[in-house]
């Protein structure tokens, strides 16, 4: 993996992102002729969306609407909040986090865990907006309670345990590892 390079596609519709990525890849190939690549897209339900075929090694698609949907894990939020908040706010923040997830019906179904949960709600909800962007998002609710609590996406991800990371993410990194070993 020491020869990996990552480039963000900066959002937009999937077709435009792929076209920009293709141009970038063609330019890189002029410098490194044997370069390999892998493109990773959010799941798109629009009529113009394309979805990579299962055997495609260079195109990967999350099975959830936004990458933030993989951060819908209350315990990871609580651990992250405990790292940055004053001790006197910890219980209150934890309760607010639990209430948020319960209020949004984003709780684990019986006999499921975060790694294998398949409930459709985790795929289709707009995690980007409800967790971070909306005025009443979890991020903003917690920050209003304690201004020191600025839980960025990376902080939540770093607070996740291996068993809380969904199988989609494990699968992506396995594909990335396989690609790097083939290069």
Regions found by a protein language model. Name each.
Residues 1-65:
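Conserved helicase/translocase motor-coupling segment
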Residues 14, 64-68, 135, 169:
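Short runs of predominantly hydrophobic/aromatic residues within well-ordered alpha helices
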Residues 28-29, 74, 177:
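Generic alpha-helical secondary structure signal
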């Amino acid at each position: 993996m020491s020869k990996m390079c990552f480039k963000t596609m900066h959002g937009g519709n999937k077709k435009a992102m792929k076209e920009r990525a293709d141009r970038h890849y063609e330019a890189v190939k002029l410098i490194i002729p044997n370069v390999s690549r892998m493109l990773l897209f959010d799941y798109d339900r629009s009529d113009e969306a394309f979805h990579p075929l299962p055997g495609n090694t260079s195109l990967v698609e999350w099975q959830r609407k936004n990458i933030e949907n993989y951060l819908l894990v209350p315990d990871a939020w609580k651990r992250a909040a405990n790292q940055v908040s004053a001790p006197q706010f910890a219980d209150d923040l934890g309760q607010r986090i639990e209430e948020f997830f319960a209020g949004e019906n984003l709780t684990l179904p019986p006999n499921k865990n975060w790694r294998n949960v398949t409930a459709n709600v985790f795929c289709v909800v707009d995690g980007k907006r409800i967790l971070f962007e909306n005025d009443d998002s979890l991020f903003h609710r917690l920050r209003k309670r304690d201004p020191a609590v600025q839980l960025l996406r990376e902080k939540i991800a770093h607070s996740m345990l291996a068993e809380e990371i969904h199988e989609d993410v494990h699968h992506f990194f396995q594909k990335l590892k396989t690609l790097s070993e083939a290069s």
